[in-house]
Every structure is written in C-alpha cells, then in structure tokens.
Amino acid sequence: MDFDSYDKKKTDLIFVGDTDNKTLGEFNIQAHPEDPEDLVNSFGNVSDDNPLLFAYVAKPAANKITFKDHPNIYNHKLYDYYAKIETRTYEEMKDKLAEYDTNYKVLDPKTSKFHEHDALGLYGNQEEGIYWVITNLVRSESNELKSLYASGESGWGYATYLDRLSKRMGEIQYQEGSEGLWIRGRYSRLGKSSYDMKWGGVQFGGDYKNTERKRIGVALAFDNGKADFNHVDGKNDLHGFNLMAYDTWRHEDGWYLDATARYGKFHNKSHVKTITERVSSNYRQSIFSLGLEGGKRIILNEEGGFFLEPQAQIQWASVGKASWKTSNDIQAKIKRGNSFIGRLGTQLGKEWIDSKNRKNNAYVKADVLHEFGNGQKAEFSADGITASRKWGAKGTWYDAGVSGQFALGKQSWAHIDLEKQFGGGLKNSWQINANIRWNF
C-alpha cells in the first residue's frame, strides 16, 4: 500500500462491506517505498491525535476482519519498521474524513462517462463501522544489526580471556628439571544476553630455567569456536591463534610471579537469516595483551598438608579494529578497544605425597574479577542510516571451581581445572582445562 501522512488524499484505502468468513480473518498491510527514508516520511507526522486512516470495515464485517502490520522488507538493513495499528469510531474520525479521497469512479456504459461515488456510503451506516488507523511508526533492530552486535561481543569475550599460571602449567613448584614441555586442552562455554558461545583449543609450550627460581618459555595456541545468536536465527564461527611468551618466578617461601605477553589474531565468520535472505559477515581482528599474576602459598598445617594461596592478577588487552561490508552492503567498522581486567582470589587445598614420593594436590578456588576498561565501539551504516554499538564495558563477575595436580611419572604430571563463572551478565558459563607436563 501507498501511505502519505502529509497528503492523505494520496493514501490507499481499503473498504470492506461484508465477508463470507465464518471465523476471524487476519490481513497484513505492507508499505512499499523505494527506500527506508521514504518509509519514515510516509508516516512522518502520524500520532494519536493525527492518525492515518487505511481501512474502513462496515458493521456486517466488523467482527470478522482484523489487520496487522508486516515489517518493511524492502531494502531494510539496520532496522525494521512496524506501523502501530489501532481502531477508531466514527465519532473519533468524522472531523478527519474530509482529508481523504473516499470516492471511486464507475464507468457508465451508456454514456461512456465516469461517475464518482463515496465508498463510505456504499456499506450501510458509516457511523457503525470500524475505522482502522496507523498512529505511530515503531522502529526495531533488524536481524542483521542484532547479529553484528552478537558477533562483535562474542569476539571480544574470546579475545579478553584471562589466562592463569595454574591452568597453563599446573603446579610448577613440584616439578624438577631445568627444561620442560607441556600441552594443554581447554573447553569453554561463554554465555551473554546476545550469544551463547562454545570454544575449545589446544596449546603447546616449552620452557627452561634461566636461574634457580625462574622459568622462561613460549607457547602457541589454536582455538575454534561457535556462537549461537540469541533472539535471531544466526551463528558465528570463530578461529583464532596466539603466541605467548612468559617469565615465571617462584620462591622457596611460597611467593610467585608470572608475567605474560600474548599476540594473536582471530577470524569471525557469521550469518543470519532475515525475512528475505541469508546475510553473511566476515572479518578479522588482532589481539595483544600483557599480564602479571602473583600470590603466595601459605602452609596451614605441615602434617596435614593443608594450604591457602591468595592471588592477584591484572591483564591489559588491546583488541584490534576491523572494517568490512556484509553480503547485503552494510558498512561495518569496529574501533580498537582496550580491556583492563583485575582479579583477586584464593585457593584452599591439600597436598600429599604418594607411595612413590611424588607430590600431588587438590583444592577449591574462588575469584572476583572486574573489567576496568571501556570496551569496544562499533558503527554500522547502510542507506544513509547509522547505528552505533558498544560491548565489553565495565563490570564485575565471579568464578568458583575445583582443581588438582597428579603425578603420572617421575618427571610428568597432569593438571585438571574445572571452573564455573557467574555474575556480570554471564549465563551458563564454565570452563575445563587439562594439561600434561614433562620435565627433563
């Protein structure tokens, strides 16, 4: 239908006198401008006090006909537009009917002339009919915009992951030998309001003792993940890698420090279904982070082997910018963003020596984490319309879990870590880490 809230005589009108329907008939109305800006202009000044009439249903059909709006599917990209539909009585509309062209023309075959008739007068008493009107144009985010936000936010969640010494290398104070190799597998589930992501990876590392108390090493990680978008029919595939260098110091009295530097890249490839098509998006971002972790293991009971280990950690991460076009020509730009996460936590556990004189342990842990950074900003534009979004802003969340290390041989160990994360908008988020280390 054609609508014009400024010149209402140009607006298309529907007239229904009666219907054979035994049950309620529901009809969609659809505006079809050449571009979204024309759609906005079509309803530019409608309101409760200035409704736009589009249909009149006479009394015989009044309880058999209803109308609803369909989203604007022509060239829509960032937003969907819905007309708010209501009904009015004759008393509410009688002073406004003169603004519309309710006449129609009929050809007289005898005279070959057209005669005008008032359509409202054809269907009985127009005072008893129902007048269907539009009172507002409601704008909502399109599936494309929702998916672009979810893809960006899930990539941020992956990029700002906070690694830890124990998850990476286990209990290195138990490990003898000047050189070591290790491999770690990890699986994470990270849920937010816009997405539910599962990702896993493998990390390989090696290090050596450059002094009696320090180890220097490097590690290479490869990750793959999938995110289901909430509220829309879409998914995101994520592939990433990173190279890490670390310098770990541990003192005999229980103190330790672990410094890390990490650089990597990840690739986001997403798609979402709209009313008319499948829209895809493809882009890459970089990651650079620096971290410092420290703590002290306090032996609570020498004979029982119970210990307490308070910990503190900070990580700064820079997530790179990206610029690309979606398959339906939405221009997308993500600006570089900075994350600064702090963690305070503790471990409480027990150490024991097995029959072969090898140390093992098990413990529970809990942490509070806070994001001090301002997150990452993005801008999406199409057809002269722009939408700005932001993710990764300040917030606090928590984790709790169980962990332990067990000797496999004289110079080999296995470490397992199970962790549940909650608060700060997280939903159904948890992580599993398992690593094996060999020393020489």
State where each predicted segment sits.
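Extracellular beta-strand/loop-rich repeat segments of large surface/secreted proteins
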Residues: 1-51, 59
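Membrane translocator/pore-forming domains, dominated by Gram-negative outer-membrane beta-barrels
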Residues: 2, 177-180, 184-440
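A structural detector for beta-sheet-dominated domains
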Residues: 2-4, 16-17, 30-32, 58, ...
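Interface/linker segment at the passenger-translocator junction
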Residues: 5, 51-56, 71-190
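Polar, low-hydrophobicity, Gly/Ser/Thr/Asn/Asp-enriched low-complexity stretches outside signal peptides
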Residues: 10, 23, 36, 64-68, ...
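Intrinsic-disorder/low-complexity loop/linker signature
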Residues: 37, 112, 384-385
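Short, surface-exposed loop/helix-turn segments at secondary-structure junctions
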Residues: 41-56, 63-66, 380-386
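Charged/polar, low-hydrophobicity segments characteristic of intrinsically disordered regions
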Residues: 61-75, 217
